[in-house]
């Protein structure tokens, strides 16, 4: 460890503290104790290319711990990425390139957004899954084309280790025998409340060794040579690696080792103390040219070596006449994995009737052969959800090119793993029962924030399957899904709408939630593929006069149409509107909305879910026929009757409201 290393590390510390002090918020403790690790990663290990930051074989860095973000931004700045002094000065400010929780921005060196504690672990695992999949696709074309061998590094804190989704992702990584995955854990045993001895039991090293990780634990966390040795050993271990840094929080601060240094700016005296201790008297937000050159030269020297070998392999690949290989390289270079699925190309027999879960299996397998980049799985629910492609062979280290992923009962990790895979350009899906939505909600929000086209398939969508009891009967989940920004939720009524949903999903670059029933439903008269793109459409037009409108989604459309037919015999002429996507309908222009649902006409909504969001459609709250309480456990028809949501009860309510 030379003086140039020491100086650069100390400048990273002070620069990061300047950012926190300028923002008047942040976490100086982790910045001070992890600066040697961050510097060593960039200076001695990381294969990144500041002049070509989106190069597809670059190493990835994921910050599961948001607290370390000012240190990461400072390192990017020192390394020559497009993070300016002004960006650092605007840390945590509106519209800045340096938000407190990093947001996906590949050109700036930010490979993933940071969410809740532990979320980045699953994202890192997903990136590794995708790397392995692509790497083996390329090697399948030519065994010498090792074009994708990057490593993913994930920074962790004690909070990440305590997260529930963390254990799900860790165990999945071991089950998949992943490699090229290194976790860098700041084990400072402190949060804002104080020491963690009573909430984070010891023996972390033994725990991860027992799981199957490569584990190294460093007490000397300031020695660049030793840190580099540990990281390199983990990288080359052939296993997921956990490198534990037994740090003292807030190293060199007046409050070193105390919880007060966990969060909040340092005092002026403490900041001045650090500058004196490090003999750094540059103005705030300044770093020396010497330190920039010292770090850049190490990164460039390593890059030149790796790129020469890689470019030779890439030239070899480009000379191979293979459409498959070309499509892989194009995806990796552009990030686009377009899949063409045109619903109208398929004819549905008139007598078609089956569970939408069964129909969904068939549609997935119509899409499957269209692209090698379409894959996914379920959280221990494939037997009932049938979200499986082709046969029942699953992806593993022995079968890395299989397209089915067995996530196990890990809904939380599944969503984050899917996000990591989508960051690499794959079109992925994951499924579970709708009642388990809350288990994976954080991952859905991260998909939406990063704009990743992940498809979430939720089955068993209502109280029609009530035998298990209220804890496993959805009630407000549809409302939650429909109110996630930048996500489109679909609830198709039949096979036509289901196929239209998939055409829309594959044509859009935002995440989607597809909610489907286990009910057996017929091909409905008036149903069509194209109506899905508008969100809602007239599935049954009134005969002559318009006495009222019923709006429904999913399997309730079947009941709504029958109610309309029956009440026509009693003199009520009713239009039925199918609403496969309320999100899309509400984004249509007012003229279209008025054409489908005239505001002057009494409009009733029928849906076996919470009715809160339907006040934008129904004429009045009493015209929302919904389920706004926990359901009962029991035989479905008895439960429906008890909750006055059986067919006869609904028909009476509609007749009463329209009369």
Feature map (PLM): residue ranges:
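Conserved beta-strand elements of the Class I
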Residues: 153, 375-377, 549-551
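Conserved acidic/glycine
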Residues: 1-32, 156, 160, 164, ...
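Glycine-rich anion-binding loop/nest that anchors nucleotide
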Residues: 157, 432-433, 552, 578
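Thiamine diphosphate
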Residues: 1-150, 300-510, 515, 520, ...
């Amino acid at each position: 460890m030379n003086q140039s290393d020491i100086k650069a590390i100390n400048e990273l510390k002070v620069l990061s503290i300047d950012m926190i002090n300028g923002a008047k918020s942040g976490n100086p403790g982790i910045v001070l104790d992890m600066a040697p690790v961050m510097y060593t990663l960039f200076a001695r290990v990381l294969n990144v290319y500041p002049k070509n930051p989106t190069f597809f074989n670059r190493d990835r860095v994921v910050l599961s711990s948001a607290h370390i973000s000012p240190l990461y931004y400072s390192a990017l700045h020192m390394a020559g990425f497009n993070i300016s002094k002004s960006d650092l000065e605007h840390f945590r400010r509106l519209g800045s390139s340096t938000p407190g929780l990093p947001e996906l921005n590949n050109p700036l060196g930010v490979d993933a957004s940071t969410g809740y504690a532990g979320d980045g672990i699953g994202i890192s695992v997903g990136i590794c899954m995708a790397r392995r999949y692509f790497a083996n696709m390329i090697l399948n074309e030519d065994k010498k084309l090792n074009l994708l061998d990057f490593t993913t590094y994930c920074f962790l804190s004690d909070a990440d280790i305590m997260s529930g989704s963390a254990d799900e992702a860790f165990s999945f990584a071991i089950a998949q025998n992943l490699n090229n995955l290194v976790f860098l854990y700041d084990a400072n045993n402190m949060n804002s409340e104080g020491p963690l001895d009573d909430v984070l039991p010891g023996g972390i090293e033994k725990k991860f060794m027992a799981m199957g990780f490569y584990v190294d634990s460093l007490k000397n966390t300031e020695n660049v040579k030793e840190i580099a040795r540990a990281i390199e050993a983990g990288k080359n271990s052939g296993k997921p690696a956990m490198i534990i840094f037994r740090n003292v929080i807030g190293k060199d601060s007046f409050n070193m080792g105390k919880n007060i240094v966990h969060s909040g700016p340092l005092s002026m005296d403490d900041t001045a103390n650090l500058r004196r201790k490090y003999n750094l008297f540059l103005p705030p937000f300044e770093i020396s040219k010497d330190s920039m050159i010292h770090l850049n030269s190490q990164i460039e020297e390593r890059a030149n070596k790796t790129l020469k070998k890689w470019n030779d392999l890439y030239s070899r690949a480009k000379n191979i006449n293979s459409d498959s290989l070309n499509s892989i390289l194009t995806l990796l270079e552009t990030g686009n994995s377009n899949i063409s699925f045109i619903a109208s190309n398929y004819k549905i027999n008139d007598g078609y009737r089956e569970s939408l879960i069964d129909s969904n299996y068939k549609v997935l397998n119509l899409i499957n052969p269209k692209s090698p980049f379409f894959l996914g799985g379920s959280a221990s629910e494939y037997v009932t959800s049938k979200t499986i492609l082709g046969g029942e062979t699953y992806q593993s280290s022995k079968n890395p090119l299989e397209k089915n992923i067995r996530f196990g009962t890990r809904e939380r990790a599944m969503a984050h793993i899917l996000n990591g895979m989508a960051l690499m350009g794959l079109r992925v899906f994951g499924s579970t029962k709708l009642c388990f939505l809350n288990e994976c909600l954080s991952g859905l929000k991260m998909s939406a924030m990063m704009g990743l086209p992940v498809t979430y398939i939720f089955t068993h969508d209502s109280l029609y399957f009530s035998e298990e009891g209220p804890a496993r009967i959805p009630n407000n989940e549809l409302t939650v899904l429909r109110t996630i920004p930048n996500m489109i939720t679909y609830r198709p009524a039949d096979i036509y709408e289901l196929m239209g949903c998939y055409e829309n999903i594959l044509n859009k670059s935002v995440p989607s939630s597809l909610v489907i029933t286990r009910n057996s439903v017929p091909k409905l008269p008036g149903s069509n593929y194209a109506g899905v793109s508008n969100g809602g459409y007239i599935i049954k037009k009134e005969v002559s006069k318009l006495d009222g409108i019923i709006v429904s989604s999913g399997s309730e459309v079947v009941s709504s149409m029958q109610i309309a037919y029956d009440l026509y015999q009693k003199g009520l002429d009713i239009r039925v509107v199918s609403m496969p996507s309320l999100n899309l309908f509400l984004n249509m222009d007012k003229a279209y909305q008025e054409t489908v649902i005239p505001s002057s006409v009494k409009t009733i909504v029928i849906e076996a879910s919470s009715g809160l969001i339907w006040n934008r459609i129904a004429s009045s709250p009493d015209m929302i026929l919904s389920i706004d309480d926990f359901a009962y456990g029991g035989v479905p028809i008895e439960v429906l009757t008890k909750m006055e949501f059986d067919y006869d009860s609904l028909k009476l309510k509609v007749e009463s409201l329209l009369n």
